[in-house]
Amino acid sequence: MLATDSDPIVAIATAAGRGGIGVVRVSFGRGGEAAAQALSDALCGQRLAPRHASYVPFVDAHGAPLDRGIALYFPAPHSYTGEHVLELQGHGGPIVMQLLLQRCLDAGRGFGLRLAEPGEFTRRAFLNDKLDLAQAEAVADLIEASTEAAARSAGRSLDSAFSRQIHALVEDVITLRMLVEATLDFPEEEIDFLEAADARGKLAKIREQLAHVLGDARQGALLREGLSVVLAGQPNVGKSSLLNALAGAELAIVTPIAGTTRDKVAQTIQVEGIPLHIIDTAGLRETEDEVERIGIARTWSEIERADVVLHLLDSRTGMTPEDETIAARFPDGVPVVRVLNKTDLTGVPACVEHPAAAGDLTEVHLSAKRGDGIDMLRAELLRIAGWQAGAEGVYLARERHLIALRAAQEHLAQAADHAEQRAQSLDLFAEELRLAQEQLNAITGEFTSDDLLGVIFSRFCIGK
């Protein structure tokens, strides 16, 4: 839990380091108009007109100038936090920013001004109904976006695209709950509220809409989190060459000497806006070399955590007994793509195959050295991830959102079962609808615990 939500708070709102402009932001809590005017008098030597940019000197306690810049005063509720807010925009050097910050703290000591906690400005925006919880999370996601697609999707979430979908679902669930409750409250009435309003049809439509939202949310989560891809196999099958080919840069040392890579080498690349976290690992084999053994142990740890494993083979030898032993140790539930590398030495054309004997496993024949088949491998990784090329209107989502959507989906499925039994299960029908609504409301922040809010906002940067 953050300190006190009514305290005046201050922080540097721009990134650390040097820049053309730096911003110090102050939010004054409840009823902070007098404090805002007092601080602007102390720092700027004048009271500021609301929502007007004033070019003023920023002065210390003795009236000596610290900097000159733009001061902006936003009276409540028309500000980012919904409180009275003062922003000082000066030159973006770290020393001058620290001087302005300390000057604010000294001048505001009398009314309890303190340093803001991470995410506290956005937390107040949420508490003052300027943003819902999904939008607040989108602020952090927009700042942290690692690809253009992720940034655009976070922008759509911030613009309420995700929240509007959730609110529409909640309204439909509430409407259906009203029909069920009316039937429960007036059992003696001759009117069958559920039949008259086609309750089953309404429920089916809600479930269909929820499935669509969940599909979009999965795409958004993929944009945010990306895919962890581990390159595994015996030494000298071309794992480092494949990493370099996927990344388009010489990141790993490539030699004909087996065991060159002794620890993991990681690189994040973008494919259609999806971050792929590619991890090159030590070759898997029996060895007496202690350093190499440590690297191999780390390889298996990475494989356990992977979203996808690329099992590299030498296309000249195919699947050897040693490769069979390695494949047998791959964890259940982690997709494996068998990559037969070095087709430049065999003359086999690059291709993707689905051998009948391999079940669901896919084989990609390629040459990391020449680049043949690399695009096929990228496409296969996107297919495994479930990415739909050209998907429009995707909004960024988090694992928390997916969990809530899946839980709501399960409650609605249970509600559908109870709807079929009618009289015997009407109470349970109503309860499952209530639980589904509760899960959906948790996404936008209605009925959300303080503990969860504390975790979410603590992950923001200070000053946001």
From Swiss-Prot:
CDD domains: trmE, TrmE_N. Residues 226-386 form the TrmE-type G domain. It is an enzyme of class 3 (hydrolase). K(+) binds at N236, T255, I257, T260. One of its GO terms (molecular function) is GTPase activity. One of its GO terms (biological process) is tRNA wobble uridine modification. Binds 1 potassium ion per subunit. Mg(2+) binds at S240, T261. This is tRNA modification GTPase MnmE. GO terms for cellular component: cytosol. It comes from the Bacteria. Transmembrane segments: none annotated. GTP binds at residues 236-241, 255-261, 280-283. NCBIfam families: mnmE_trmE_thdF, PRK05291.1-3, small_GTP. Exhibits a very high intrinsic GTPase hydrolysis rate. Involved in the addition of a carboxymethylaminomethyl (cmnm) group at the wobble position (U34) of certain tRNAs, forming tRNA-cmnm(5)s(2)U34. Its EC number is 3.6.-.-. Its cofactor is K(+). Gene3D superfamilies: P-loop containing nucleotide triphosphate hydrolases, Probable tRNA modification gtpase trme, domain 1, tRNA modification GTPase MnmE domain 2. The keyword Plastid does not apply.
